[in-house]
Amino acid sequence: MKLESQFLSFLYSRGYFNQCTNVSALDQLMSKQCVPTYIGFDCTAKSLHVGSLVQIMILRYLQKFGHKPIVLLGNGTTKIGDPSGKDKSRTMLCSDEIEENALGIYDVLKKFIKFGSGSTDGLLVCNAEWLDDLNYIEFLRNIGRHFSVNNMLTFDSVRLRLEREQNLSFLEFNYMLLQSYDFVELNRRYNCLLQIGGSDQWGNIVSGVELGRKLQLSELFGLTTNLVLTSSGEKMGKTAQGAVWLNGDMYSPVDYWQYFRNVRDEDVGRFLKLFTELPLDKIKELELLQGHEINEAKKMLATEATKICHGEEIAKNIAADALKVFECNDDSGLSTFYVDRCDVDLGLPIIKLLQISGLEKSSSSARRLINDKGCKINDVVVLDVNYKLSLEHFCNASYVKLSCGKKRHLKIMLKSSF
């Protein structure tokens, strides 16, 4: 695809670009002027996780290429819940929880983009500003009349739930109208012309573009990014231990570095393009590495991704500590997992320990690991699937080193009792 604007060309070359409404007109516009662009995040948790990282990186690049990134926090729409990609309704959150989550998300985003009053500074907006005081009758007359239920039923977020005979509340069914209305309000208030979201948001985004056209606003544009899956078909940002959060108190910078260090070989090149700011020629060099050498590319991925999220100094320190751990047998940089003393006193089965620590997802995978001689306690291979961790392991040491293969290691420590 031949594109003139630096921003769209960049998205396409790095693998972000999925589809776009009237891409030629948007390309011309973005090559000539600053285009205010919004990406929305619902306030369903106190942080964002790696699954949102593509959108956050795009906010960062909007700023880099001279456009204005608008972050819309859905403290209004979170009260309803987006049905896109969901099998069931979300748990309803109270207003205090939503506001606390919004503050946490803002703290995360400040690490990635600069907020301020400049022409390309990030702008934080909350949609409760206009949604909380909506007059329902006026909203139906002025906005609702532009939506066809027949058309809404064809969108995946609705159609798939109905086909699977899963409940879709009227509350959730309204989400599309509210997201479309958000776009209109952002255009009226801040001259926002472009909305970007994941590929699962295409229906909602197009509805907003169409609503703008029917209300005779300036032409609005929508762009979606590719859904990022690992080579094993899993969504980004999930591990056996839970979500890979972007704030350090919910997911440590060390664990964040290790998450990217341990990606599959097949994912390294793609993730370097998506989650680092390395130039493409450097990434091409790293993609040529084969065999054991590919670990150097993984270390680069981990360090560069951690640098953006947690800062350069922290990233370099973690990389240096990892070098000691994996190449100099120094355990000081390992993540720590705590176990209850009473469980260890009774004898903690190695199968259970591998699961609760997050090193293995299931008992069957833990058994396979042991049978393949891939599990070690203090660098000694565990041969018995019935092996148990006991207090004797801690007689002369403050921790036990638990290893799965060559890459995954944890320090197992006893919880302090007070």
UniProtKB/Swiss-Prot annotation:
GO process annotations (BP): tyrosyl-tRNA aminoacylation
Chain ranges for the short sequence motif 'KMSKS' region as given in the UniProt record: 235-239
Domain of life (superkingdom): Bacteria
Record CDD domains: S4, TyrRS_core
GO-annotated molecular function: ATP binding; RNA binding; tyrosine-tRNA ligase activity
Binding site for ATP: 238
Pfam family for this entry, one: tRNA-synt_1b
InterPro entries in UniProt: aa-tRNA-synth_Ic (IPR002305), Rossmann-like_a/b/a_fold (IPR014729), S4_RNA-bd_sf (IPR036986), Tyr-tRNA-ligase (IPR002307), Tyr-tRNA-ligase_bac-type (IPR024088), Tyr-tRNA-ligase_bac_1 (IPR024107)
E.C. no: 6.1.1.1
Catalytic activity: tRNA(Tyr) + L-tyrosine + ATP = L-tyrosyl-tRNA(Tyr) + AMP + diphosphate + H(+)
Protein residues bound to L-tyrosine: 38, 175, 179
Location of the protein in the cell: Cytoplasm
Annotated keywords: Aminoacyl-tRNA synthetase, ATP-binding, Cytoplasm, Ligase, Nucleotide-binding, Protein biosynthesis, RNA-binding
Domain S4 RNA-binding intervals: 348-413
Enzyme class: ligase
Listed NCBIfam families: tyrS
Function: Catalyzes the attachment of tyrosine to tRNA(Tyr) in a two-step reaction: tyrosine is first activated by ATP to form Tyr-AMP and then transferred to the acceptor end of tRNA(Tyr).
The protein's name in its UniProt record: Tyrosine--tRNA ligase
Organism: Ehrlichia canis (strain Jake)
Protein encoded by which gene: tyrS
